[in-house]
């Protein structure tokens, strides 16, 4: 939908990302887009290093937190909290259909001027429908639950550890990690 030049970097490879940013220096704007947690293997993006490169090359940072919202980070604020880059990420996207109870819909957040521009210029947004009130209520309740207590996050961490241990006991070779995505 966008006619901007795109540069693809090797997954989680900061040297390759820097190469792309150097190549993009002549572009009017630069936006680094990444998942916070990669869904295929549970790898966590190196957001601290990505933000450092964004500062160095005057780029915005956009993080998709679909696989992190609600359960990654001390209070469930995702990889942005986990990597200690709160306030350094310009655009955050996520879904209400995974950790927040399976409600439909999603979200994009950022500074007011960015959100205003997206509302005016994003064709998918212009032609989309609002969420049904019961879905909004369900998502808000899920946010309340993960915000008020770490009990559910703690239980998920324990369940993930037991699951990993069980798989390894039965001879499965797993990639290291603590994320609930456990690639087999």
Residue ranges of predicted features:
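Active-site PLP attachment segment
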Residues: 75, 81-117
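A short beta-alpha structural unit
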Residues: 39, 140-144, 164, 179-184
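Conserved PLP-binding catalytic core of the aspartate aminotransferase-like
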Residues: 155-161, 169-184
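A short glycine-threonine-serine/GTX helix/turn-capping micro-motif
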Residues: 105, 122-131
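Helix C-cap/helix->beta junction micro-motif
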Residues: 2, 56-57, 170
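Active-site phosphate-binding strand-loop segment of PLP-dependent enzymes
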Residues: 7-63
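Amphipathic alpha-helix from the class-I
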Residues: 134-154, 165-170
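Substrate-binding/gating loop at the entrance of the active-site cleft, primarily
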Residues: 1-2, 15
């Amino acid at each position: 939908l966008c006619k901007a030049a795109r540069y693809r970097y090797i997954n989680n490879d900061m040297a390759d990302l820097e190469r792309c940013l150097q190549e993009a220096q002549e572009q009017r704007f630069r936006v680094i887009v990444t998942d916070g947690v990669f869904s295929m293997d549970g790898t966590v993006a190196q957001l601290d290093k990505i933000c450092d490169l964004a500062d160095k090359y005057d780029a915005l940072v956009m993080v998709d937190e679909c696989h992190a919202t609600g359960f990654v980070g001390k209070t469930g604020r995702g990889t942005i909290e986990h990597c200690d880059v709160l306030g350094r990420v310009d655009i955050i996207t996520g879904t209400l259909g995974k950790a927040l109870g399976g409600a439909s819909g999603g979200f994009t957040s950022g500074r007011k001027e960015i959100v205003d521009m997206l509302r005016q210029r994003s064709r998918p947004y212009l032609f989309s429908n609002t969420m049904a009130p019961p879905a909004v209520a369900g998502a808000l309740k899920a946010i309340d639950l993960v915000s008020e207590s770490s009990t559910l996050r703690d239980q998920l961490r324990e369940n993930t550890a037991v699951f990993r241990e069980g798989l390894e006991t039965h001879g499965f070779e797993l990639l290291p990690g603590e994320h609930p995505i456990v690639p087999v």
